[in-house]
């Protein structure tokens, strides 16, 4: 029996976002006090992200007959990430050249106050590529879970799952136990997800109440350019990849609409990570591929962040009337391919990454970041939305490459017959 429309989660989230915007606009002081509602919801989701990634990856790897598959899946995923990330970086650069959102500002760099962005610049210089790689190794297993470090948890899960696969039947009891824990954790996620409208309301009310719609007006062209470019990336680049793989990007976006609305309301792609993993399994992707690709993608496949980086750098150059040579722009692309990974998992990662990228183009002052500091919060929603769609598509593609994509399940899920697919997935 079909639910009444007002009981459907995505309808509730849309309503909550609208109410949050209204409250933030008309009663900003009250709206700012709603921040704990959004923060609380994100914390509830984050408390199960680590255990879910661990259990999903462990059971997926433990069930593999060929351990070479782990390396093969990881290699294919990283290759895909690098190619698509490069496309996102180039598209951001091209769109800014064509639409020129920074032209006409005529800002003198000497008049900019860089104190507000100094902390981001310090963090950018504080973490090298070696530091990033060393950070993947946790001090202790417990510390990785306590800090919620996704890549550290992934490393532990890879080792744990590999040992269970090597033990075979002797490790079956442990594997079955972890599989049972996985079902319990997803049950918790289902309960917490019912609170998504409250979290979306609190986060959106706070954003509008604190920053105000008026703060958007001077930089509307940049915001519009970024949103338009992200839509083009999803529909054209990811759309072409999806069509080549055998599914529709429009239907895929419709399939994960609840997760996208949660991300829209909270500005956090992590808030929808557990639900995304579960839905990808129900759509026919193998558990082992989902467990490896999705968590890794959250650090290495940030398509929205990549578009933002090259666009923001070129916008600052245009606004301050600084001409970049083609060689400088190619250098910018090369460095951005590295920095977009190096600052992942750090608070304020988008701005830290931008600071690290600007550091290699000395003709553009770091203080120029202050031009977009005020609107960064409004652009973060689009970054997060693009990131989550990109990671979802990546998982389906790698599953198809591994010939572990159940296309019948995928067609059923994307055509709206998700109930049957979900029931079958639950039995498996």
From Swiss-Prot:
Q: Where are the transmembrane segments?
A: 8-28, 44-64, 78-98, 148-168, 184-204, 222-242, 307-327, 355-375
Q: How is this protein situated with respect to the membrane?
A: Multi-pass membrane protein
Please give the Gene Ontology molecular function terms for this protein. Answer: fumarate transmembrane transporter activity; malate:proton symporter activity; succinate transmembrane transporter activity
Q: Reply yes or no: does the keyword Zinc apply.
A: no
Q: Which Pfam families match?
A: SDF (PF00375)
The source's superkingdom equals: Bacteria
Q: Name one GO cellular component term.
A: plasma membrane
InterPro entries attached to this UniProt entry: C4_dicarb_transport (IPR023954), Na-dicarboxylate_symporter (IPR001991), Na-dicarboxylate_symporter_CS (IPR018107), Na:dicarbo_symporter_sf (IPR036458)
The record's keywords, sorted A to Z, are:
Cell inner membrane, Cell membrane, Membrane, Symport, Transmembrane, Transmembrane helix, Transport
Q: Where in the cell is it found?
A: Cell inner membrane
Presence of the UniProt keyword Transmembrane in the record: yes
Q: Which GO terms describe its biological process?
A: L-aspartate transmembrane transport
Biological role stated in the UniProt entry: Responsible for the transport of dicarboxylates such as succinate, fumarate, and malate from the periplasm across the membrane.
Q: Which family does it belong to?
A: Belongs to the dicarboxylate/amino acid:cation symporter (DAACS) (TC 2.A.23) family.
Q: Which NCBIfam families match?
A: PRK01663.1, PRK13027.1
Query: What is the designated name of this protein?
Result: C4-dicarboxylate transport protein
Q: Which organism is it from?
A: Burkholderia pseudomallei (strain K96243)
